[in-house]
Swiss-Prot record:
This is Iron-sulfur cluster assembly SufBD family protein ycf24. Belongs to the iron-sulfur cluster assembly SufBD family. It comes from Porphyra purpurea. One of its GO terms (cellular component) is chloroplast. Pfam families: SUFBD_core, SufBD_N. GO terms for biological process: iron-sulfur cluster assembly. The lineage of its organism: Eukaryota, Rhodophyta, Bangiophyceae, Bangiales, Bangiaceae. Its main location: plastid. Keywords: Chloroplast, Plastid. It is found in: Plastid, Chloroplast. Signal peptide: none annotated. InterPro entries: Fe-S_cluster_assembly_SufBD, SUF_FeS_clus_asmbl_SufB, SUF_FeS_clus_asmbl_SufBD_core, SUF_FeS_clus_asmbl_SufBD_sf, SufBD_N.
Amino acid sequence: MVNTQNQISQTSDLDYIVNQPYKYGFTTSVESEQFPRGISREVVKLISKKKNEPEYLLNFRLKAYEKWTKMKNPKWAHLKHPNIDFNSIIYYAVPKLKKELNSLDEVDPEILDTFNKLGISLNEQKRLSNVAVDAVFDSVSIATTFKKELAEAGVIFCSISEAIRNYPDLIQKYLGTVVPSGDNYFAALNSAVFSDGSFCYIPPDTVCPLELSTYFRINNEESGQFERTLIVADRGSKVSYLEGCTAPQYDTNQLHAAIVELIALDDAEIKYSTVQNWYAGNKDGKGGIYNFVTKRGLCSGKNSKISWTQVETGSAITWKYPGCILAGDNSQGEFYSVALTNNYQEADTGTKMIHIGNNTKSKIISKGISAGKSKNSYRGLVKIGPQSFNSRNYSQCDSLLIGQSSQANTFPYIQVQNPTAKVEHEASTSKISEDQIFYFLQRGINLEESVSLMISGFCKDVFNELPMEFAVEADRLLSLKLEGTVG
């Protein structure tokens, strides 16, 4: 008989697989232009001047900065990390480029090579034919593909800097309407210093002909990344948006504080998918990205729908709660999430579903996986307002523990203010057992593959919601991160 306990707990198995090298940890050597370290009113003005922004946007930034200086860094999350020295960060760092890039031939070959190594070809002839990409490197958008094809359908997809110049009416109308500049500490910081990001507008009665995607890459060790994404789906339109990210392997920590605003008008649908693979630090907890992100969608129109799907495997610290405000009657919000922590990673993530309109529906499927000495917390809010009649919510929060030293926590908050509402909440915590492993081993399946199969089964409800390319990548990513963590 196989001694299952010995095989599961072998240190060599654990070390071999838990500490697989982070293959995106390389750095790119490029000449860059950057501001001195530190944040001040003058730095905020410099960012706005550098980007030649209109006065209303400068005022937006300055008001956000004033709010930020009066706010305190939130301490309520189930996270423990050193205080962030905001004056040690460079808030603007861009590779030296021409002011206007007319073709990829004018982009530094080192940068193009970086995205090729990441599997993100910016050459349209070599790209997947159904995906348009906006590539962001440190503080600037490098290139956006298939803009011509999208424009023929009336779809606007470009960097937010370009949108500020070319579509000022749309930016002024929608920017900051879902995530106000003073929404929270990190949203205020982003609103003051954001330098680039993506903008997407889908015109009425249009199904976007391509998947839209943005890939974020932090390269500079001393800079933070503060991108801003704004997606507007006009009445009767539909769009699917993909987001990916990586960073070099440094012993220090870098700050990523982003904002994503989604707006769905009458009968519109937005599907937003993320595979987050920032550098998570080494096996001793040294280095890694501090990921403090505000993501929110507004279903402002009747019959509108916003769906968030995320796979979180990276970052030393993750603080992130994508949510939906269901203001339109019959609107729907969905949240599908897999959050993996390993070694000394810490994640406090979840969602908020705010029901305002009548007959609104929300669905939450959260899968948390904790390994090593990590902490993984789900924090969710379901709120049904007094005027939201016949609204429904279903929440399912499952945690899986791997090893003896990891933690899983769930902090659900449910507030129902209307007697016609129906709310269901399920939660479970489980562990990969010896019996399960033994079952696989007896059928000739090795330990690593056994763990991988069980993880895939645990996460399938979320993976099924991802676009096919992302689902395959997410499954492979979890297998790589979790192999051999049973102990």
